[in-house]
Each structure stands twice: as structure tokens, then as C-alpha cells.
Amino acid sequence: MAKSSVLSTFAAAAITLQLLLSSASASPHMKYIDAICDRAHDQAFCVKTLTSNPPTAAPIGLLPLAEAVINLATSHAEKTAIFVDENAKKDPAVKAAFTECHKAYMAVAAALKSANMKLKASPDTANYDVRASSDHMRRVNELVGKNSDKTSTTLKEMTVQMEKLLDLAAGAADAVDDDDENIRLRV
């Protein structure tokens, strides 16, 4: 008797979980998140990021979600620029490289702000602005990629995160455009 009670409880829990998962993926919000995450290189990261951040978790439309995604990337670029600037002042050994990294992150933040302003009127241009930021990330990797100090390691981790967020931002701009001419850039 106890064994069948445990089994029926387990079955009920499994059915409830299945219903919750299917209703979450069928929610109107998920179609906007899917429109962006389908364009991302790391779709699991995309879904996790967009569903766990309040500004992106329950979008009211594709354009507001895309703007929120680009804002998320902008915020990370600005925070990383502050981190780099503060550490350039503290450690003379990394000052020259970090000064250049600071410039790169400031350029990324500016490009993302520009992309967000252009998103509605010209999503192709916004997509270009976001994708051009990848050049700055390559520069940061060139400057600190071989460094093994703790601060450089932290910056490398922040740069990996920035690259992932840039991918989401590019996917967001592309989703707003939705003409799939940029699909070749995602392959």
C-alpha cells in the first residue's frame, strides 16, 4: 500500500512538472525569448540569461526585449570598463594593457548605446554596431590573453561573458530585423 502511494505521488509530481514546463515554453513571453535565443551560438546560456534577469524575463514584445538585452550587454561593458580602469590605477604592471582595455570597453558601451538608439528604425545598422564590438573584444584578448595574474584572469572571464552578451545582443537586433539576411553571420 505504501509503495503504491509513493508511486502515485511520484507520478502526480511528474505530471505537474510536465504541465509547468509545457506551459512555460508556451507562454507568450517565450516566443520573444525564443526569437532571440534561436539566433544565439549558446542557446542554453541565452535562455538562462533572458529568463533569469528581471528586465528580460517577461517581455511585452520583441522590440522591448531586444532593447533590454542590449541594455544588459551595455551594463556589463560599463561595469567591466570601471573594473579595468580601477585596476589599471592600482597595478603598474598591467597599467598600459588595462588602459587600452578600458578604451575598448568604453567603445563597446558606446556602440551598444548607439545600437539601442538605432534598433527600431534600422535594426541592420544596430546589428552591425553590436557585431563591430567583437573587434574590441579580440583586442582585449590580445592584450591580456597571456597574462596569468588574478586581475587579468578576472578580466578574461569578464570578457568571455561580454562576448556571450554581444552574441545575444546581435541576435536581438537580428530578431527585430527578422529578414534573415544576417543568418550567415550566426553560422
What are these regions (language model features)?
Residues A26-V187:
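Folded extracytoplasmic luminal domains of secretory or organellar precursors
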Residues M1-P28, V187:
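Terminal membrane/secretory targeting segments in land-plant proteins
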